[in-house]
Amino acid sequence: MLTADDKKLIQTTWDKVQGHQEDFGAEALQRMFITYPQTKTYFPHFDLSPGSDQVRGHGKKVVNALGNAVKSMDNLSQALSELSNLHAYNLRVDPVNFKLLSQCFQVVLAVHLGKEYTPEVHSAFDKFLSAVAAVLAEKYR
């Protein structure tokens, strides 16, 4: 459960992500593809080379979706319902992959935010991204 302090930290930190959605998203995806190569199977039609337009475009979509979730922290299920349907019923993505991408996104935040990515911010984002992953996996049950 996100506390009021967690939500404030997430919103304040998210302001620093603004303007970098494509870069941060592409970097998180690249980290995931390298660290967890099995995740590439969900992108057979993509050019997965670093910096490709497809990876950058999808990275931007991912981070923008997270931005919408940040705006809707009190109602994640409604905010992410369409994405949950898409990933569960159309794309059939194994829900474990949401956790893998979350981990990679946290690394990207830590790299780019440096000392501003405090243990408290890390904890808040861990809770938030876990909640997002859980909501995205709801339709699999």
Curated annotation (Swiss-Prot):
Heme b binds at residues 58, 87. Residues 1-141 form the Globin domain. One of its GO terms (molecular function) is organic acid binding. The gene is HBAD. GO terms for cellular component: blood microparticle; haptoglobin-hemoglobin complex; hemoglobin complex. The lineage of its organism: Eukaryota, Metazoa, Chordata, Craniata, Vertebrata. Heterotetramer of two alpha-D chains and two beta chains. SUPFAM superfamilies: Globin-like (SSF46458). GO terms for biological process: hydrogen peroxide catabolic process. It comes from the Eukaryota. Keywords: Heme, Iron, Metal-binding, Oxygen transport, Transport. The sequence shown is that of alpha-D. Red blood cells. This is Hemoglobin subunit alpha-D/D'. Involved in oxygen transport from the lung to the various peripheral tissues. The keyword Ribosomal protein does not apply. The keyword Magnesium does not apply. Belongs to the globin family. PANTHER family: HEMOGLOBIN FAMILY MEMBER, HEMOGLOBIN SUBUNIT ZETA.
